[in-house]
Structure formats: C-alpha cells, structure tokens
Amino acid sequence: MKTLYSLRRFYPVETLFNGTLALAGRDQETTGFAWWAGNARLINLSGKLLGAHVAHAGLIVFWAGGMNLFEVAHFVPEKPMYEQGLILLPHLATLGWGVGPGGEVIDTFPYFVSGVLHLISSAVLGFGGIYHALLGPETLEESFPFFGYVWKDRNKMTTILGIHLILLGIGAFLLVFKALYFGGVYDTWAPGGGDVRKITNLTLSPSIIFGYLLKSPFGGEGWIVSVDDLEDIIGGHVWLGSICILGGIWHILTKPFAWARRALVWSGEAYLSYSLGALSVFGFIACCFVWFNNTAYPSEFYGPTGPEASQAQAFTFLVRDQRLGANVGSAQGPTGLGKYLMRSPTGEVIFGGETMRFWDLRAPWLEPLRGPNGLDLSRLKKDIQPWQERRSAEYMTHAPLGSLNSVGGVATEINAVNYVSPRSWLATSHFVLGFFLFVGHLWHAGRARAAAAGFEKGIDRDFEPVLSMTPLN
C-alpha cells in the first residue's frame, strides 16, 4: 500500500524504546511512526483507521450524554440556566424542548431523554470502534471495496467528500423539520418576552439569505452574525442543506477537473489540513455568533450579550431616575452630552453615557420602545412594561465578563453576582480551539506540500548521534 512516498523521506522521526509496544503492522518498523504518533500509524490501514474514528465518535457522544445528564442532575428550575454554568441544556432549550413562555423550563424530561439517547448511542459507537480497532479487517479494500480507498485516488476522495456533504445537508434539514413540523423552536422575539413557536413563513429569498454574506463584518453590519429573526435562520438552513446535498451528489457523480487535480495536494495529510482549516473557520464564526447573537443564542438561556448587559444598565437607571422625577429627555451628563438619551452618528435617539458604543444593539426587551427615529421618548415615559424592567435589571447584573475564578460581571457593578456567563465560556473556548485548529492546518498543510514536492525539512536522521547510542531499554 505504500505507493505515495518513500518511508525515509515521509516518516523522518526516529524514537527509541519502541519494540516493547509493537502491534503487528502498527509498529515503527512497518509504519515509520512511533506509538505516540497515534493514528499516523494507520494511514494505510483503512480498517484500523475506521476503528479509531468510530471510537473517537463514541467518546464524543459519550461526553455529550454524560455531560447532559450531569447538567440535568444539577439543574435548579428556579434559577436561570446561565447562572448555573450550563452549556448543553441551553442548546436543547433553544430547540424548543422543555420550555414555555419567557424561556421558563416547564419539563426537564426531554433533557433526560437526550442524555440517555446519547449514552446508548455512545455504547454502540464504542463497541464498533473496539471491534474495528481490534477484530475487524486491517484493510477494507479487499473485503469491502466500497468502503476502501487509496489516498491519492482522486475520484474516490471526491466521492467520500460528496457523502460527507450529503450528511451535513441532512443535518441542516433536521433543524428545518424541527422548526416547521416537530413542535417548533424557541423564539426570543415572540411577543411578551419569548416563546416556543413553529416557523411558518420561511425566508427563502436568495437576495436576503445571501445578502448576509455580502455585509461588512464590522459595526452594525455584522455579516451573518447579525441575523435577528428565526425565519431567516431556518430559511438559511434550507438553502445550506440544499446546497450541501446537491454539492454532495455532484461530487459523487463527477471526477475532479484538471485544474483541481493540478492545484490541490492529494494525500491523507493534505486532506487533514483542509479539514482542520474548515473546522478553524467554523470555530471562529461560532465564537462571534455566541458572543454577539441573541437570536440563535437566546439571552434567556445563555445570559445577555456584552452590549445587551451594558444597554440594560442604562435602561435600568433611566427607569429609576425617571421615577424619581428626572426629565430623561433633557438631562445633561458630565460631558455635556445627554445623560440618559443622545443621538447616534446617523441621528437615531440612543442611550447616553458609556453605553453609546453599543447603540446598534437589538434585543427583544428593548425593541418595543423604539420608534422610527430610535428610542421613542413618549414610549419611554408611558409604555415601559414590568417584564422589561425585570429583564433589564437581571441582565445588567449578569454581564458576560468573568474570569476563570468566577468573579463575574462588570468590575464596578456593586450588584453583580459571582458567575461566569456561558457566552464567555463558549466564545473563549471556540476562539482558542479555532486558533489551535488553524495552527494545525498550517502545520499539516506545510508537511503535505513538502512531501508532495519531494522534500522534508528537518534533521538528517541517517547520521543522528542518538542512533549510535545504547537503547534506553
């Protein structure tokens, strides 16, 4: 099977004490990789590599199920999810399971079911992983040619790509079906403070859906992260699912064009680098989404966004001082600008003070108070509802600014509580993991290109001093 590279060039690493851990066909002598290089030993053993991937999927699903049940066991219905350090239950609640008006949890049984289903699935995957790693055929090409492959077989690789794209498309449509037919999803914009509803009037207009991609990523534009209604989100999944499925069929039925055969590197390590690059992009986009977007990630479950907590503070003190007799329309702040209200660069009436930088914020508790020219003074004087006051006071004291030792909230906010927002956790983890994946992409892309060009950078291993020394064992 070693048809692509000379072992000496492609597997330059020599390590000691390898003999004791040798497995037939998976030791350093036969693969060029030591035990610690993990799946690199299985580059040409498709059956064993299948086992490694299935077992890895089992570990992922086991974590999901176990963590899900852990969160259910610790969940206190009287407290908001974001005060309890939960990262999985908010996702289930966003999908409309177990919640009612205002995001209140009315039934935790669906969460329990989700955890148990994932645990059962992980057992099946774990068994399959162990079977293929230890008992199944080492290579699939002979017994199961459909599942076999050679890394440089361009046609087979694009067929595998097509199958993956179809699976991703089906995944996108699962969300669409949940929103349309299976109980709906949670809409933070539903009147009166959010509720679960079926999405009936999908946005399928390509100018709207693809218009998001053409927006600037900065300021009030916010690229795709600026999406703020569920019709657009679910409609976008219809488009995405359709494109993935059609693209998958295309890649299964066609062979790569000549320009693609020339431009791309066709090796296992190259495919690894492409995948890491794609995952890195996903990580960075997810980071921005969970940090800024309060429609796909409702604040009832994930806590307020940073801009939302800041605007909530301005709103809370406007309400308080207005009750104490302040004229919020004309009061002047220490800088000579409006203390409570001022104008944005484009003329809208916005909150004054430090929160002016977040004037683009849109949030369901605030939008009813806006008119055609920004915040409406008469509505601020007459129309503020108790639920809006309660929600903004809650969000003011739960800003997503927290350190790892759980001293959460704004440093100067005397009413803040000790907590770290799930938005902080999810945004930080996805940024850091996205960055690591990007470094891995650069590393493996460089190695794959070097191998394809016929050279490897590094020490000349043929004359390394350590080779003449006594083995450690």
From Swiss-Prot:
List of residues binding [CaMn4O5] cluster: E367
Q: What GO biological process terms does the UniProt entry carry, in alphabetical order?
A: photosynthetic electron transport in photosystem II
**Can you list the disulfide-bonded cysteine pairs?**
none
Pfam families named among the record's database cross-references: PSII (PF00421)
Residues passing through the membrane, by range: 69-93, 134-155, 178-200, 255-275, 291-312, 447-471
SUPFAM superfamilies linked: Photosystem II antenna protein-like
Show the GO cellular component annotation of the record.
chloroplast thylakoid membrane; photosystem II
* Residues bearing the modification Phosphothreonine: T15
Membrane topology reported for the UniProt record: Multi-pass membrane protein
N-terminal signal peptide: none
Q: Which GO terms describe its molecular function?
A: chlorophyll binding; electron transporter, transferring electrons within the cyclic electron transport pathway of photosynthesis activity; metal ion binding
* Cofactor remark from the record: Binds multiple chlorophylls and provides some of the ligands for the Ca-4Mn-5O cluster of the oxygen-evolving complex. It may also provide a ligand for a Cl- that is required for oxygen evolution. PSII binds additional chlorophylls, carotenoids and specific lipids.
Per the UniProt entry, the propeptide covers 1-14
Which superkingdom is the protein from? Eukaryota
State the compartments where it is located.
Plastid, Chloroplast thylakoid membrane
Name the keywords, alphabetized. Acetylation, Chlorophyll, Chloroplast, Chromophore, Manganese, Membrane, Metal-binding, Phosphoprotein, Photosynthesis, Photosystem II, Plastid, Thylakoid, Transmembrane, Transmembrane helix
Q: Which residues carry this modification: N-acetylthreonine?
A: T15
Q: Please name the HAMAP family in this protein's record.
A: PSII_PsbC_CP43
Q: Which family does it belong to?
A: Belongs to the PsbB/PsbC family. PsbC subfamily.
Q: Per its database record, what is this protein's job?
A: One of the components of the core complex of photosystem II (PSII). It binds chlorophyll and helps catalyze the primary light-induced photochemical processes of PSII. PSII is a light-driven water:plastoquinone oxidoreductase, using light energy to abstract electrons from H(2)O, generating O(2) and a proton gradient subsequently used for ATP formation.
Q: How does it assemble?
A: PSII is composed of 1 copy each of membrane proteins PsbA, PsbB, PsbC, PsbD, PsbE, PsbF, PsbH, PsbI, PsbJ, PsbK, PsbL, PsbM, PsbT, PsbX, PsbY, PsbZ, Psb30/Ycf12, at least 3 peripheral proteins of the oxygen-evolving complex and a large number of cofactors. It forms dimeric complexes.
Give the matching NCBIfam families.
psbC
| Protein name as annotated | Photosystem II CP43 reaction center protein
Q: What is the lineage of its organism?
A: Eukaryota, Viridiplantae, Streptophyta, Embryophyta, Tracheophyta
